[in-house]
């Protein structure tokens, strides 16, 4: 009987210890930028945290080809992103997609970017004295 109690307590302790080691995150965190893909979640109001997505969803993305340069696209155009100070977005093609979704708003914002941060699975591109930012989320695809 004593052996069963000790075995039961040991099992309970191991089970509890194993649960304590469980990672408590529902996303993957990249350790480097090269090779990672990022999708725009939306425009964030830094004071309230409210996210306003840009239409059409999934149309504003990029993938890093080095630690400071990424290639991607908007609704119809191709773009290059440079992580400099300030960050710099270049629209490589000039197909008129200003009428598609929120592309015109996106183009106005990227001309005024001031700084960026990379924290875990988020890239934030700040503008308007850091009152707002473009929030990009790491994408596994």
Q: Each predicted region: which residue ranges?
A:
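Sec-dependent bacterial lipoprotein signal peptides
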Residues: 1-19
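Lipid interaction determinants
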Residues: 21-141
